[in-house]
């Protein structure tokens, strides 16, 4: 569960290392974001010569959460850290060309097939 002020790692090669959630999209009273939800983020730490710079405000999709994802068969998939993939402002496609770490199958339902195809492992 990601909410405002939550810090996340970045799971792509866009140049950002850590980001802060500043808004959960999807309604005025929406409080939490889970895997597959889009959030508005601010870049807090970035590497030199990356595609994004510190202080930029962009959209991102959550790909891993510590809270986990509950499947219809009752199993729960949990991760050690919260992570997101940064999206392009206009097309909502990933900025990076590589995804690091596993992602969940729930992204397929949310129409993020590009992230699924770039990921090294889909759980």
Curated annotation (Swiss-Prot):
PANTHER family: 50S/60S RIBOSOMAL PROTEIN L14/L23, LARGE RIBOSOMAL SUBUNIT PROTEIN UL14M. It comes from the Bacteria. Part of the 50S ribosomal subunit. Forms a cluster with proteins L3 and L19. In the 70S ribosome, L14 and L19 interact and together make contacts with the 16S rRNA in bridges B5 and B8. This is Large ribosomal subunit protein uL14. One of its GO terms (cellular component) is cytosolic large ribosomal subunit. It comes from Hamiltonella defensa subsp. Acyrthosiphon pisum (strain 5AT). Signal peptide: none annotated. SMART domains: Ribosomal_L14. Gene3D superfamilies: Ribosomal protein L14 (2.40.150.20). Belongs to the universal ribosomal protein uL14 family. Binds to 23S rRNA. Forms part of two intersubunit bridges in the 70S ribosome. The keyword Ribonucleoprotein applies. The keyword Ion transport does not apply. GO terms for biological process: translation.
């Amino acid at each position: 569960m990601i909410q405002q002020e939550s810090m996340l790692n970045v799971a792509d090669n866009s140049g950002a290392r850590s980001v802060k959630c500043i808004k959960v999209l999807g309604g005025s009273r929406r409080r939490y974001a889970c895997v597959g939800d889009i959030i508005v983020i601010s870049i807090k730490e970035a590497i030199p010569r990356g595609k994004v710079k510190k202080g930029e405000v962009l959209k991102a999709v959550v790909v891993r959460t510590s809270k986990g994802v509950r499947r219809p068969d009752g199993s729960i998939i949990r991760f050690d850290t919260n992570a997101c993939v940064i999206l392009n402002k206009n097309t909502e496609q990933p900025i990076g060309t590589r995804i690091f770490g596993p992602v969940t199958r729930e992204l397929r339902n949310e129409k993020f097939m590009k992230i699924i195809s770039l990921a090294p492992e889909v759980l």
